[in-house]
């Protein structure tokens, strides 16, 4: 049995013009309909809000997508930008990449900007929260995937999520030695970190409205 009548509670809050925040529990590529099937969960991400609490998608005013400054995955499934070298190990260790529920180590790779753009569009994301940018502190170079060298068109890859043989194409950016850790004002970030963020916005087609610079709540830059 349910603890209470959530649908009625939500409608009462709506009628009272209260702000309501819903939080998705999975990554977009684990969505049963839009993800890398069959390596998915049994539920939908954004669509699950309507099914779970009985509100219309038109009632959602703003959707924030959360992405790390690099890409991770737990368990099996295609991962075009996965790193099998020392850099992958470095990201995993510095980022503390262990599955919160399973305890399994996460696979790590460079940020997949192409998939970020694809899933931001399909999920109706209005703004991005970019986390763990501090994990990239101290690297001489950082990369972002902009697309793939594949026999299939990008449209076909998106439609089927057949990413097993996709070879990533990257842009390489200057890294930074000046730390971003703990910074709370965007203007106080170093030039290269700002450039990285701007490239994420350009490639994903979505503004970065929040930036996490550490594990604590106060380690956050709010731009909007």
Task: List each model region and its residues.
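Non-transmembrane, aqueous-exposed alpha-helical and coiled segments at domain scale
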Residues: 1-224
